[in-house]
Amino acid sequence: MRGHPGGEENSRRMIALSGLAPGASILDLGAGAGETVALLRALGYEAGGIDLAPRGAHVKKGDLLRVQAESDGYDGLISQCAFYLSGDIPAAFREAYRLLRPGGVLMYTDVCFAPARPIAEAAGFEIRYYEDMSALWREYYIEALWRGTADCCGIKGRCGYEMLICGKD
């Protein structure tokens, strides 16, 4: 699982930090090939995902800015490297807030040019955990250059990478 910095280890860490118990309903926003969805399901969560170009089991076509789901419908959301790609980070946080039940948790990691914390707070979230993971982004980027799969040369050196665990109370 190398579709995002830190791979499966980072996904497991986010899940642990969320405090969500197995059986909770979790939607992966920007699920891609569904690797994180598969991990969540293996850990006992009721998990599915959406992506503009779905490529995995339990991943449906959908736009994270306009999710076809009821408000307050999920215990948890996870998004790794997807809000930035949506083109509208504030709208992505607002949509995530709408989707979560009261007491729900958003697990978020992404590239950032400015801190996401104030954007998440403006959407209504309480920040429960924050970590600057820019060193992990640099390692991931260098590895992608080495493999010849880096397609984001325009952003190198100008961005960071951060993790937020956000609650909806």
Task: Pin down the residues of each PLM region.
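A short acidic, Gly/Pro-enriched loop at the edge of an enzyme's catalytic core
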Residues: 65-77
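Short alpha-helix
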Residues: 114-123
